[in-house]
Regions:
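Short, exposed beta-strand-loop hairpins at the edges of beta-sheets
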Residues: 147-155
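Short helix/turn-capping signatures at newly exposed starts of structured segments
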Residues: 2-136, 154-167
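Short Gly/Pro-enriched loop/turn and capping motifs at secondary-structure junctions
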Residues: 105, 145-146
């Protein structure tokens, strides 16, 4: 130890990343992709680690395709994140939500399977009363995070499942 070593700046060691093991309890802080063991905190820069499978540019938004991922104790779906250009702060594309959207002919079956899984894992939902006949909107809250599951019947059935802290 030299005479002037007390003036040297100590090197800060980076904190070890703690990956939660339970995706349900982790929802308050971020999303856990269970098979890969990847945990993404809400609000972090999506571009930082480039863990997405595909990126699509549109005029007013950027869509990050995550691919088929398992979340919430076994729910396996193909997820994406939409970053609207007018809502982002600066050049950072922040992770605010992940969503699954399907307009396939089996949308009603998909809705029922997702609903059954969510009710098993998260408990009973709060149902939105302001929907058109034949449409369903279910919602769960985990602290500041909203889990939403919707079934729309316009021209054909459409299911939308979304988890996020700005939803």
């Amino acid at each position: 130890m030299g005479l002037f070593s007390i003036f040297k700046r100590k090197k800060e060691e980076p904190e070890a990343a703690v990956i939660p093991t339970n995706g349900v309890t982790a929802l308050a802080e971020g999303i856990l992709f269970e098979e890969e063991g990847v945990f993404l905190k809400w609000g972090t820069d999506i571009e930082a680690d480039k863990l997405y499978a595909k990126k699509e540019y549109r005029a007013d938004r950027t869509i990050y395709q995550w691919g088929e991922k398992t979340i919430l104790s076994g729910l396996k779906l193909s997820f994406k994140t939409v970053c609207w250009n007018h809502k982002q702060h600066g050049d950072t594309k922040a992770l605010e939500s992940v969503e699954f959207l399907s307009e396939e002919s089996d949308a009603l079956d998909q809705f029922q399977a997702i609903r059954d899984h969510l009710e098993t894992v998260l408990g009973s939902s709060r149902q939105n009363e302001d929907m058109e006949p034949g449409e369903i909107a279910l919602e769960w809250r985990i602290k500041a995070v909203k889990v939403g599951l919707n079934l729309y019947n316009k021209e054909r059935p459409k299911v939308k499942f979304e988890i996020g802290w700005w939803v």
